[in-house]
A protein has these predicted regions:
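A short Gly-Trp-Pro
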Residues: 1-130
Length: 130
């Protein structure tokens, strides 16, 4: 990140995951993205709100990036207003959460094998938990 946008999260993230979908691969330039889920209303922009660039793909959650450097910052959960999936690589320090599963593994990049980390793997999006 260029540092133009600063944010804070007032409550601990409630979980994190690896996403291997082709959309995340193309947006990040990597084999997977790693995001943590916020609690409703816990994300606050501290600096650079004017630099936020938002767009909504047809088949996914609205995305937010920096208009200056292009860094992918977070996606908004369409089904739960105020809940965001924040890219863990955008934190200045330890985000305090570790990924607990892999999703969309049927689309995993063939050029980077899935790690043998013992985490659950889901062929598509992880089913909702009860």
């Amino acid at each position: 990140m260029c540092g133009g946008i600063r944010y804070e999260i007032s409550e601990p993230l409630v979980g994190a995951s690896y996403c291997h979908c082709t959309r995340c691969q193309r947006r990040s330039g990597n084999a997977a993205s790693v995001s943590g889920r916020t609690t409703p209303g816990s994300l606050r922009i501290v600096q650079g709100e004017e630099l936020l660039r938002s767009w909504s793909p047809e088949d996914g959650n609205p995305k937010v990036s920096c208009s200056r450097c292009g860094s992918q910052l977070w996606a908004e959960d369409r089904t739960q207003p105020g809940v965001y999936f924040v890219r863990l690589g955008t934190f200045d320090s330890d985000p305090g959460v570790r990924p607990s599963y892999h999703q969309f593994v049927d689309y995993a990049a063939v050029w980077e094998p899935l790690p043998d980390d013992g985490l659950p793997r889901y062929p598509e999006r992880r089913p909702p938990t009860t």
